[in-house]
């Protein structure tokens, strides 16, 4: 019969344990690399989102527009400078041509000079006469216009129409200016609303991404918590299993002690029975004693078999042989117990001589069977002790591994909580900064609108004041002309053409 303590699967079990440790280390390294990649991705996304927010902000827009306006003004100034230079070159060229012509006409001959003087005198006389004639006609026409009531009425009507038309033109210009101002205001409001909507949309997307990331992290944390809970349950189960193994070990030791005590009692009883030489009663007592020993061995094997059956779901492959050996031993002991009961029934009909002979024969058989049983029981108990020791060692290693994994999970959970808190604080800071930026833009826009409104009101007040002054001046001039009545104009003597 093979010893149940020798396991042929021990090298494969060692290799399996080593492979599990290698896979666990590879999984931890893979999780660490994945965590580093995720952290790098989140950092890059934070930098990218901050840069995009900075580039799409109102300040960046103002800086771009200011740079564009400066470039346009610089180009406009350069163009105007080139135009002025071109005009100066043209004027210098004309002046140079005039100087050259004057230099050519500096020294004419006498005949030419006399002819030029005569022509100049005639031209001056003709021009003087023409001016006198034109002046006389102009004075007569002016006198006629001012003394003609119809023309004065027409002039008054034209002046009134001009004032009315100018008023309408001013109203039209004011209306157009108001419309342009309203359009500009509407355009700025639309631009501001569009910018605000873009900012809100960007913030909404960032909030959705943040919530999605928080949800994902919460799921990961939940998985880690579940794993931690499973580890704790595994540790508790291993602890209970350790306690069970210890109790079974104590039971085995107790059973071993009981067997030793029974053996000692049997030896003492044999010695007493040998002295009394009561073979028949001694045979019956010996048979009962053997039955008791067999019954005790059967109970021990039944307890071992029951324990082995309970542990089959954990170590089925390793326990099958031990269960089979224990079951075989139980059957053998039950057969011997039945045989001893039959022998006990035969003892009542034996005589003294035959009883002595049977006693010696049976004593030899019993001694042989006892030694065989003791050898088998020692093997079974030793195998059970070794199995319990192996189970306790495996349980201790599993508990240490579970505790180590639990510590790692707790550290990882603490690191995740710290990272999540820092990211929440950073997101809250960015959100507060963006809200402050939007509030500043709103306040700046309101200030600009208020300044524009104040400027428009001042311009309108100034226009109304100018119009009032013009109307007042017109009214005063009309009253003055009515009070003075008609007055003939005094024209000064026309100046001579020679002066």
UniProtKB/Swiss-Prot annotation:
Residues 12-38, 71-133, 168-306, 359-484 form a coiled coil. Residues 260-426 are annotated as: Trichohyalin/plectin homology domain. PANTHER family: TRICHOPLEIN KERATIN FILAMENT-BINDING PROTEIN, TRICHOPLEIN KERATIN FILAMENT-BINDING PROTEIN FAMILY MEMBER. This is Trichoplein keratin filament-binding protein. May act as a 'capping' or 'branching' protein for keratin filaments in the cell periphery. May regulate K8/K18 filament and desmosome organization mainly at the apical or peripheral regions of simple epithelial cells. One of its GO terms (cellular component) is keratin filament. Its main location: cytoplasm. Residues 69-78, 172-209 have a biased composition (Basic and acidic residues). Residues 74-499 are annotated as: Interaction with keratin proteins. The keyword Cell inner membrane does not apply. Keywords: Coiled coil, Cytoplasm, Cytoskeleton. The gene is tchp. It is found in: Cytoplasm, Cytoskeleton; Cytoplasm, Cytoskeleton, Microtubule organizing center, Centrosome. GO terms for biological process: apoptotic process. Belongs to the TCHP family. Residues 46-78, 169-209 are annotated as: Disordered. Residues 50-67 have a biased composition (Polar residues).
């Amino acid at each position: 019969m093979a010893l149940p303590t020798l396991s042929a699967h021990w090298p494969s079990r060692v290799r399996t344990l080593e492979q599990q440790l290698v896979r666990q280390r590879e999984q931890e390294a893979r999780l660490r690399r994945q965590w580093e990649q995720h952290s790098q991705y989140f950092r890059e996304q934070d930098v990218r989102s901050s840069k995009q927010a900075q580039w799409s902000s109102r300040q960046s827009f103002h800086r771009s527009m200011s740079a564009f306006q400066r470039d346009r003004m610089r180009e406009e100034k350069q163009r105007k400078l080139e135009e002025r230079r071109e005009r100066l070159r043209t004027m210098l060229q004309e002046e140079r041509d005039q100087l050259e012509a004057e230099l050519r006409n500096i020294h004419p001959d006498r005949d030419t000079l006399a002819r030029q003087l005569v022509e100049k005198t005639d031209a001056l006389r003709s021009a003087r006469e023409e001016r006198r004639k034109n002046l006389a006609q102009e004075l007569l026409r002016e006198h006629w216009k001012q003394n003609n009531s119809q023309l004065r009425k027409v002039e008054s009507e034209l002046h009134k129409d001009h004032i009315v038309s100018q008023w309408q033109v001013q109203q039209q210009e004011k209306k157009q200016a108001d419309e342009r101002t309203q359009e500009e205001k509407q355009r700025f409001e639309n631009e501001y609303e569009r910018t605000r909507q873009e900012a809100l949309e960007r913030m909404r997307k960032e909030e959705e991404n943040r919530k999605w990331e928080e949800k994902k992290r919460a799921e990961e944390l939940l998985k880690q918590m579940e794993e931690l809970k499973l580890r704790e349950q595994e540790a508790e189960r291993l602890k209970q299993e350790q306690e069970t193994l210890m109790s079974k070990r104590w039971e085995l030791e107790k059973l071993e002690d009981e067997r030793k005590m029974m053996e000692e009692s049997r030896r003492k009883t044999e010695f007493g029975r040998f002295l009394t030489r009561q073979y028949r009663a001694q045979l019956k007592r010996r048979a009962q004693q053997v039955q008791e020993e067999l019954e005790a061995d059967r109970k021990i094997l039944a307890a071992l078999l029951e324990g082995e059956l309970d542990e089959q779901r954990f170590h089925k492959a390793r326990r099958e042989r031990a269960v089979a050996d224990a079951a075989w031993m139980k059957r053998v002991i039950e057969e011997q117990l039945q045989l001893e009961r039959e022998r006990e029934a035969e003892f009542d009909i034996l005589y003294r001589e035959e009883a002595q002979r049977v006693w010696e024969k049976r004593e030899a058989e019993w001694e042989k069977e006892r030694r065989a049983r003791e050898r088998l029981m020692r093997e079974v108990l030793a195998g059970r002790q070794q199995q319990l020791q192996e189970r306790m060692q495996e349980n201790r290693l599993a508990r240490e591994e579970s505790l180590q994994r639990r510590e790692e999970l707790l550290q990882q959970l603490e690191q995740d909580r710290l990272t999540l808190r820092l990211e929440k604080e950073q997101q809250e800071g960015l959100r507060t900064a963006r809200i402050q930026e939007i509030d500043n833009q709103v306040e700046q826009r309101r200030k600009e609108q208020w300044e524009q409104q104040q400027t428009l009101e001042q311009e309108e007040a100034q226009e109304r004041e100018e119009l009032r002054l013009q109307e007042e001046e017109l009214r005063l001039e009309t009253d003055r002309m009515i009070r003075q009545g008609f007055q003939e104009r005094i024209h000064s003597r026309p100046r001579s053409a020679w002066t």
